[in-house]
A protein has these predicted regions:
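Bacterial Sec-dependent N-terminal signal peptides
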Residues: 1-21
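Extracellular glycan-recognition regions
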Residues: 21-191
């Protein structure tokens, strides 16, 4: 009985470890001046006057917020827990999925909350974006098109376009591989 229990615990621990990302081994795009990575948690001082902003009627583009990423190919589910000591309007922290400088989306919150879970599910040429307040019940906020079979950069991101900076905390980041739907369907039809 004990052997089975130890094997089950080891298998569960190995599975959890394999699905989690090691933040220490990820790459920075616009590394912040001050951050720590410890026990699977990233705490960063988000620099002032940083943002991700695409071309609009305002006439400028900005691409200088801190973004810690891993490159992921194929179909996947990415999830992260985000919190921030937001100070002024437009302070932001979340998860970015990036192919190149092109698109972004926002969840508007009417009141401050202690934390938020974000989840992205990539299937074929679509990415579904979800949020949750408890990591149990997720609400879809958007579906977007993304060319399939191209690698994407995925990870925690923050920006402070208006203020003097703030502290953001990211934890429980993991990317789980999902089987390619076309291959699964082909295998089922060609047995």
């Amino acid at each position: 009985m004990k052997k089975y229990f130890l094997l089950t615990v080891f298998t569960l621990a190995t599975t959890l470890w394999a699905n989690a990302q090691n933040l220490d081994k990820m790459q920075w795009f616009n590394e912040p001046g001050s951050y720590t990575i410890k026990n699977g948690k990233l705490e960063m001082d988000v620099p002032a006057q940083t943002d991700y902003w695409r071309i609009s009627h305002y006439g400028f583009t900005v691409d200088d917020g801190p973004f810690l990423y891993t490159t992921v190919g194929g179909e996947f589910e990415a999830k992260i827990k985000v919190s921030g000591d937001y100070k002024v309007r437009f302070d932001q922290a979340g998860m970015m999925i990036r192919k190149d400088p092109s698109d972004w989306s926002v969840i508007e919150l009417k009141e401050p909350i202690p934390f938020l879970w974000l989840k992205a599910v990539r299937r074929l040429d679509a990415i579904e974006l979800y949020y949750s307040f408890d990591d149990k019940e997720y609400t879809m906020m958007r579906t977007l098109w993304m060319q399939d079979n191209c690698p994407l950069m995925v990870g925690p991101v923050a920006a402070c376009p208006d203020g003097q900076g703030f502290k953001a905390v990211f934890s429980h980041f993991k990317v789980k591989h999902l089987p390619d739907q076309r291959r699964v369907e082909w295998l089922m039809n060609n047995q």
